[in-house]
Amino acid sequence: PVCGWGVYADMKDSNQNAVYLSNFGLGLGRDYYQKQSESNTEAINKYQVFVADIFKLLGDANADEKAQKQVAFEKDLAKLMLTNEEDRDPNLSYNPQTMSELSKLVKNLNIPAFLKKVGVNTDKVIVGEIRLYKEYDKFVNEKNLPLLKDYLRYNLVASNAGNLDGALDELSFNFYSKYLNGQQEQRPMNKRALSLINGVVGEAFGKLYVEKYFPAKAKEEMVTLVDYLKKSFAEHIKNVTWMSDATKEKALHKLSTFKVKVGYPDKWEDYSKMSLSADASLFENLIKVTQWAYQKELDKVGKPVDKTKWEMTPQTVNAYYNPLYNEIVFPAA
């Protein structure tokens, strides 16, 4: 999108949600544009062919020209984006802006009016790519309007290629999965369908999974085990010789606030307002899923963070640490 938004925990106050502004997306990782090499140049050239092929499938006669302009546009955007090295500094991507400041920052696009129109009622946003936003008017202007329309049209189709038709799906697979990531064959359709459903209603699947493989008793036993480990670790911190007393105090405080989630959420996701239809196409149902998810985002604006939520489903074979919440999560699988 030209300008998008999302609701996440405020980096400077993890108990409160904040509205974060996103910006133009790139068809390739920013490193491809920012770091010159033969392999990156080859990837950009193949990407341009891919973009042209999408436009051709959409019936555009001047597809090659549109693709060339879009890639040049993305190159210019990438020059202003944070590098991977800069992105490691969280302070560089934390730039709070009031609506008044945002209006002065970007003049050609009325972002405060846009946010209000789409239901986002906030008096402050956090901008990640502030360097790019300072130059937004160079990209969003009347001269670029045809290019912006093509850019948005392309991104709408390309981001849904796997859910539209076979030709688009094959194009997307051949470029992103096969060329960029080395995957030689598409996964079987049943596995792709399972992944899609898991992504949409993952906790509904998770509830079935834990009923069969991870009963409440198993969760209780794991929570008890983790509590013992925390107590043991606290004793270890107290006895180490290479830490100062002040450092030990901070470490013990962090450990005392350290949260562990095991198995599955105490409160399951509520899908009752997700309206799907057996008579609708896959894409039509996915639009309904998007509308449901959009409303969930709107509901978080201005509210405290719900720290009972999980970022993984119980059936996921993985684990994660969330530094903002100081929590570690072990799904049942």
Predicted regions mapped to residue ranges:
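Noncatalytic, helix-rich "gating/capping" subdomain that lines the substrate-entry/channel surface
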Residues: 1-224, 228
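Intrinsically disordered, low-complexity linker/terminal regions across diverse proteins
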Residues: 76, 105-108, 126-130, 173, ...
